[in-house]
């Protein structure tokens, strides 16, 4: 049996080796195909701290945790001492002192995790951190389930043409995927409103209008328009939902131009009739539901890797 991946924390895809990615895909596929969860000889406690709204990621992580046999400790940010001014570090210090071994965290602050894993000798926080999404920075679990879904379809990444479409500058999904896909050999393109494109993307791919790209793409990755991150953005008012769909959305005309084996992806939640025509969300080329299903198994693989890295539950 191949040696399984061990990590101390899982906060970004940037520090994963290609071999690590392969191990995670293989392990997630093992779980998806009915493989048994590892036996734990000691109880492992996990808390999910979601400071931003979430359905898919939160529920998917909890499902993964329960399938692995972990004990989930409820945590509601709205009724926690965070509302009294307690810092994230002190919240985790408290949970750790009470016996929590792992925390999955979704937070609005970019790179929030750096102050939790880069500790000085006087700090006593000892807890595995899994990033459930940080601001517009990274979304490693979404990226990994996307990578798994693409691998299931094509068996490789080399030479694939992938276009990421939409609210690029506000998207942690775009950042994680562009970093990993290019490293794995895919050719990445960007599309959508030009004022949501940033020069930081230049080293990962090129921008072009969607209608110039659509026929040649293997993967079309649609992004949600993130209205909650547009506070003060005058450009958002330049178009209505109908106009956005006409200019940048996946409608029937664009769908019919796709290659025979092309797939469409979306991290969710979908704004139906905006990024994606309502009647096409579950069309044959759509992998939206598959992504959500794969998310549970990939998150099982990610959690298990951190458990092994920290020797939790007797795993090594």
Curated annotation (Swiss-Prot):
Assembly with partners or alone: Heterododecamer (2C3:3R2) of six catalytic PyrB chains organized as two trimers (C3), and six regulatory PyrI chains organized as three dimers (R2).
Gene Ontology MF term list: amino acid binding; aspartate carbamoyltransferase activity
Record field: catalytic activity: carbamoyl phosphate + L-aspartate = N-carbamoyl-L-aspartate + phosphate + H(+)
SUPFAM superfamilies attached to this UniProt entry: Aspartate/ornithine carbamoyltransferase
Pathway involvement of the protein, from the record: Pyrimidine metabolism; UMP biosynthesis via de novo pathway; (S)-dihydroorotate from bicarbonate: step 2/3
Chain sites annotated for binding L-aspartate: 84, 172, 224
A GO CC term attached to the entry: cytosol
Signal peptide start-end: none
InterPro entries (UniProt xref): Asp/Orn_carbamoyltranf_P-bd, Asp/Orn_carbamoylTrfase, Asp/Orn_carbamoylTrfase_sf, Asp_carbamoyltransf, Asp_carbamoyltransf_Asp/Orn-bd
Enzyme Commission number, as recorded: 2.1.3.2
Gene Ontology terms describing biological process: 'de novo' pyrimidine nucleobase biosynthetic process; 'de novo' UMP biosynthetic process; amino acid metabolic process
Database matches in HAMAP family: Asp_carb_tr
Name of the top EC class for this enzyme: transferase
Function: Catalyzes the condensation of carbamoyl phosphate and aspartate to form carbamoyl aspartate and inorganic phosphate, the committed step in the de novo pyrimidine nucleotide biosynthesis pathway.
Protein family membership: Belongs to the aspartate/ornithine carbamoyltransferase superfamily. ATCase family.
Binding residue positions for carbamoyl phosphate: 56-57, 106, 139, 142, 268-269
Protein name: Aspartate carbamoyltransferase catalytic subunit
Pfam families found in the cross-reference section: OTCace, OTCace_N
Keyword set, alphabetical order: Pyrimidine biosynthesis, Transferase
């Amino acid at each position: 049996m191949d040696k399984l991946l061990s990590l101390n924390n899982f906060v970004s895809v940037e520090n994963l080796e290609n071999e690590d990615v392969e191990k995670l895909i293989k392990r997630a596929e093992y779980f998806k195909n009915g493989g048994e969860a590892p036996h734990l000889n000691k109880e492992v406690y996990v808390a999910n701290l979601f400071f931003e709204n979430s359905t898919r990621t939160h529920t998917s992580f909890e499902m993964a945790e329960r399938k692995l046999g972990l004990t989930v400790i409820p945590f509601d940010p709205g009724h926690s001492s965070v509302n009294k001014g307690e810092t994230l570090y002190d919240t985790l210090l408290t949970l750790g002192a009470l016996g929590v071994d792992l925390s999955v965290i979704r937070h609005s602050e970019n790179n929030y995790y750096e102050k939790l894993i880069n500790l000085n000798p006087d700090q006593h926080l000892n807890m595995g951190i899994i990033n459930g999404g940080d601001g517009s920075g990274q979304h490693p679990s979404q990226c990994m389930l996307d990578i798994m879904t693409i691998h299931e379809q094509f068996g490789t990444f080399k030479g694939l043409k992938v276009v990421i479409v939409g609210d690029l500058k506000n998207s942690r999904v775009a950042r994680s995927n562009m970093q990993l896909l290019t490293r794995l050999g895919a050719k990445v393109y960007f599309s959508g409103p030009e004022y949501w494109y940033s020069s930081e993307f230049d080293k990962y791919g090129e921008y072009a209008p969607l209608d110039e790209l659509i026929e040649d793409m293997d993967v079309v990755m649609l992004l949600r328009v993130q209205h909650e991150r547009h506070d003060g953005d005058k450009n958002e008012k330049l178009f209505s939902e109908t106009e956005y769909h006409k200019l940048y959305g996946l409608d029937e005309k664009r769908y019919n131009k796709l290659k025979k084996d092309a797939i469409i992806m979306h991290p969710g939640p979908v704004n139906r009739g905006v990024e994606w025509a309502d009647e096409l969300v579950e069309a044959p080329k759509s992998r939206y539901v598959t992504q959500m299903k794969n998310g549970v198994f990939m998150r099982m693989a990610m959690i298990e890797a951190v458990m092994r890295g920290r020797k939790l539950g007797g795993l090594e």
